[in-house]
A protein has these predicted regions:
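Glycine-rich acidic phosphate-binding loop
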Residues: 232-239, 251
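Flexible, glycine-/charge-rich segments associated with ATP-binding catalytic modules
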Residues: 2-15, 31, 35-38, 252-331
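Short coil/turn segments at secondary-structure boundaries
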Residues: 181-185, 231-233, 242-245, 308, ...
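Conserved ATP-binding N-box helix of the HATPase_c
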Residues: 152, 182-214, 222-223, 280-288
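Short adenine-binding "F-helix/F-box" segment of the Bergerat
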Residues: 240-247, 258-259
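ATP-lid-like helix-loop hinge signature
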Residues: 159-162, 177-178, 196-234, 261
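Conserved catalytic submotifs in the C-terminal HATPase_c
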Residues: 165-177
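Signal-transmission coiled-coils
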Residues: 2-165, 179, 183-187
Length: 331
């Protein structure tokens, strides 16, 4: 091995160790916070399960060879809580409901960061089975959107029997891709937003009458390192602005009798489908990208979702740890 390649190998090994240590530190802090936070009595069993998973994840993350196992345990921290919290069905606006929202938002925000660190560690360890955190250097946004639309239309065909048409429109100065760095996790909010729009069309008129509605429109632009995507559908929209806001709150919009859907074969879906998790998780991913997700629309007409994000790759978490801690304490 040449001296240059050996130097690069050592740099990668050092960076992998840094990622592993950062993941261990995050999981240690998470376990400590879950053990110390005061919650209503009815939430104590949920907290105890989450704290136990966090402690196990912390122990696994302390050893480089078991980082992948640590991530699996980190998934359980939030995953175990969802069905338990769902059963509480607290009235919207109550103190317990507010605490549940804060608990889920904090847990899944931590989980997104854990996933990114674990994935980066695997990349630096040269694990060939791990996809890159970056979609592709200088990849045009329209290529990412075309891929997301194709995948989501495949999902809609499998679930409903047919998929709505989608028009992809470039808006503004979107021709330059120089310096563009799109993280792979932008795909998640795109899929969730497109999936909701396609589902609203199918539920409004039926899969066999989708041609009676105008196509879904996806507009996009990139300018000065900032990306914007707007998805507009004709699926009926929300009855009021408050309903649009509520749709991005955990566990609020789901039917309590509806079971999770595990059937989509391309695997980009989530085990939380059917639990009222899609849009809240999409919003957290948008914040992790340094942006925001906004929902609006005309009652009886359609919905409009606007996703803004940093397209330079410089942002990791839109909220610093101090801000997250303040949110958690207020809960």
């Amino acid at each position: 091995m040449s001296a240059h390649r050996l130097s690069l190998s050592r740099l990668a090994s050092s960076a992998a160790a840094d990622c592993q240590q950062a993941l261990h530190a995050r999981l240690a802090r998470q376990a400590a916070q879950l053990s110390a936070v005061a919650l209503p009595i009815k939430l104590q069993p949920t907290r105890e399960k989450m704290a136990a998973a966090a402690a196990k994840a912390e122990a696994l993350a302390a050893v480089p060879s078991t980082v992948a196992g640590a991530l699996q345990e980190a998934e359980r921290i939030a995953g175990d809580a969802v069905p338990l919290l769902r059963e509480l069905r607290e009235p919207v606006g109550s103190q317990t409901e507010h605490t549940i929202q804060a608990l889920l938002e904090w847990s899944f925000s931590e989980l997104i960061a854990n996933r990114v660190l674990a994935q980066r560690h695997a990349e630096l360890e040269r694990d060939p089975s791990t996809e890159s955190m970056m979609i592709e250097p200088d990849c045009p946004l329209h290529a990412v959107l075309e891929h997301a639309i194709e995948e989501t239309r495949a999902f809609a065909r499998e679930k409903f029997g047919e998929a709505p048409e989608v028009n992809l429109v470039a808006a503004g100065d979107s021709s330059s891709t120089l310096g563009l760095a799109l993280p792979a996790y932008i795909i998640f909010p795109l899929h969730e937003l497109l999936k909701n729009s396609m589902g609203s069309h199918a539920r409004r008129v039926g899969a066999d009458r989708l041609d009676e509605l105008p196509p879904i429109t996806v507009s996009y632009a990139v300018h000065d390192g900032w990306g914007g995507i707007e998805i507009e559908d004709h699926g009926g929209g929300w009855g009021a602005p408050a309903a649009a806001d509520a749709s991005a709150r955990f566990l609020v919009t789901t039917n309590p009798e509806r079971e999770p859907n595990y059937q989509y074969s391309r695997d980009f879906g989530s085990q939380f489908e059917g639990l009222g998790m899609g849009l809240p998780l999409a919003r957290l991913h948008a914040r992790y990208l340094g942006g925001e997700l906004q929902l609006a629309g005309l009652p009886g007409m359609g919905a409009r979702a606007s996703l803004g994000f940093d397209a330079t790759g410089d942002r990791t978490d839109a909220l610093c740890e101090k801000e997250w801690a303040q949110r958690w304490v207020r809960a």
